[in-house]
Amino acid sequence: MSEQKAFNLKIDEQNIAWLGIDVPNEKMNTLQAAFADEMKAIFAQLKDSSGLKGLIVHSLKPDNFVAGADVRMLEACKTAPEAEALARQGQELFQQLSDLPYPVVAAIHGPCLGGGLELALACDFRVCSDDDATRLGLPEVQLGLLPGSGGTQRLPRLIGLLPSLDLILTGKQLRAKKAKKLGVVDACVPQTILLDVAKQFVEKGKKRAKQKVTTKEKLLSGSGLGRKFVFEQAAKKTHEKTRGNYPATVAILQVIQHGLEKGMKQGLELEAKRFGELVMSNESKALRSIFFATTEMKKETGSEAKPSKVGMVGVLGGGLMGAGISHVSVAKAKVPVRIKDVSNDGVLNALKYNYKLFDKQRKRRILSKAQLQSKMLQLSGGTDFTSFNRTDVVIEAVFEDLSLKQQMVADIEANAKPETIFATNTSSLPIHKIAEKAQRPENIVGLHYFSPVEKMPLVEVIPHESTSEETIATVVALAKKQGKTPIVVKDQAGFYVNRILAPYMNESAHILLANEPIDKIDTALLDFGFPVGPITLLDEVGVDIGAKIMPILVAELGARFKGPDVFDVLLNDGRKGRKSGKGFYTYKGKKKEVDKSVYKLLKLTPESKLSDNDIALRCVLPMLNEAVRCLDDGIIRSPRDGDIGAIFGIGFPPFLGGPFRYMDQFGLKELVEKMNQFAEKYGDRFAPCDGLLTRAGEGRRFYDN
């Protein structure tokens, strides 16, 4: 344990104890097993101190309370009982805090998450700042875990069963006012008076009285029948969402129910036991690997060079992508944006799109009316290049047409500063071709966003051979400020995400042409863990977009990207997907149904012959094969980048950890065997690539751990 202490105890003149948390050499406070002895000693001292009026637990960090338990300590656990012991230790410490004979108040400013909230729940009262940085939640489920230090038992007893299930099963984070409304905190006040208000709670001199239970809560969780109904409904809804792929949700329901029926002591025992089991599960290991990867990536700059300052962004094109890019630039990166479109309608649509998103935040009380107006004032636009001479980065989001994009480069070189970076949001065109006629090719880079931009977390940064290191560093820094996770990929057709997606989509078309029903194919991949099935995805992206991308991949990467002739048949029948109201499905508002006339159009007689598992593997194996080729061709820099790209870019099942983690878990020898079986049965497109064969033959893995 470090010599510096994480917990600082002071007793003031009024006999109020102040426990300040300040984890040494860390920006954020996190709870670590190494602090256990220190905490035990402090709680023993507090228990034995006579005449104390109360205790206030607060943070000595300027911007966070406790961001959770340090997830790294779980990696040292080799068995479920070891992980269970960690949970029991946390439970015992928080129980000691709860058992102190005087009022204990948590004064919360900034993130109060996971173990941090469990610490606060063990206090009698909670007071938080109304600052936007204050967030409260139990996000353990997102790591494939459950709250292991009493959270599953204390929260339902504090705020009731239904709101607790919602918070613990989703891992959602509450803003301060919502936390007050739900009863998670007792007061929500300006940060300047936070500690004074905490003191007032101590001065009342009372421990927390038992919660008053509402009639609704009595009916729902107080009676065996009501409780049974709530848990049955919660299990049903959760299974619909997770399709049985996340064991943590099942454990959460079981542990909360057990605690309400058998009492808190037994509830805590089961909480610790299930926590230990979940720590050792493949799902949690995969989800934790994503957490560690994204944490690492936040520190990376993509280049050795220093990024240039970005004071203003220009956006070319007011369509869906341009509107989304302008939104994240203003809302997240907090830089003013100038939009240019060929028509005023295009600019107007982009502004309306932004207003709609900001207004949603106003309705949810995230933004005030004045803040909304202030955000909208950061956006302007027109049909000419006015103000583009002040832009530092221009992001182009026009149609996928090479000569049009080259013209955009020429226009920006003529109308912006010599050092202005031109970032193209192409999804398929090679960056070196877009930069071919540029006067300053070092300023040109690919910046591939995913739709809808304001929701999708990934961006691919694609330098071509002449892109400067400073340009790379600048767009990586900008993407991070926009709230994105950037991965730097090599300039080759399809880049990374679309390149691994193409064989997956092609195989779904092969399966369809073998008479498997459309909804059966989609369901098989949903059950595998994808957020949408491949046929639905094609409709969402647009059949016309797929038809444009595939020939580019075939031309540059070879015949293995040639899919069945489905696109042209659909497009000739006016089926572009959701945007045209019909594709493989028909769309009426939010409802979609399989358009059975597609079968006739494609001369098919739908009949289910394949198992769900075979359908899923047939789609996924070509994707895995292509991911390995991308790694060996230098398209991605590491298996980690490949995993994050696939999860954040196309929704590869997070509980599998990404294509490379999944291959390690599957076993490379077994994977090669399965691919060879499929190659024999369905064709050479399943033949394992050289990189897979070599690694399998040498007994190597993609990851060491």
From Swiss-Prot:
Pathway: Lipid metabolism; fatty acid beta-oxidation. Residues 308-705 are annotated as: 3-hydroxyacyl-CoA dehydrogenase. GO terms for biological process: fatty acid beta-oxidation. Keywords: Cytoplasm, Fatty acid metabolism, Isomerase, Lipid degradation, Lipid metabolism, Lyase, Multifunctional enzyme, NAD, Oxidoreductase. Pfam families: 3HCDH, 3HCDH_N, ECH_1. The keyword Cytoplasm applies. The record marks 118, 140 as: Important for catalytic activity. Heterotetramer of two alpha chains (FadJ) and two beta chains (FadI). Catalyzes the formation of a hydroxyacyl-CoA by addition of water on enoyl-CoA. Also exhibits 3-hydroxyacyl-CoA epimerase and 3-hydroxyacyl-CoA dehydrogenase activities. This is Fatty acid oxidation complex subunit alpha.
